[in-house]
């Protein structure tokens, strides 16, 4: 999801005012905000997640939304920056199977530079201007909105810069036998 893609989507969607923030104070709020953002996305999302635990993008409802996005047609793209993709593979995270089946749509990269590997925050960005930001990815305390492009912009810039400095996560690629 490049800056151009986001702006193209915004012009197609009729960019409106920012929506009120969603509460993110505990695990329940976090799961609800994540699902609402995934449901509101049309074709593209970007996820920065240091580590994937079972309760992060692993629920049946979240996977259904991720599958819907991945199969939404032309322009569908799920970009994920993950610090340790091997850990998610070893733990059989449910997102791995989706990424392997749809490897041209679900793009996974891993940071190479120390500055990126030290980044402890996580976020989800949608093509509708939505975002979920956790300053500490290990804690369920952050902020979110279904549409707030002004708040999303610095996160999108950070994601795009990190994406360029990252390498393709080959551990998740399906084996061609």
Predicted ranges, named:
Residues 1-46, 51-177:
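PLD/PLD-like phosphodiesterase catalytic module centered on the HKD motif
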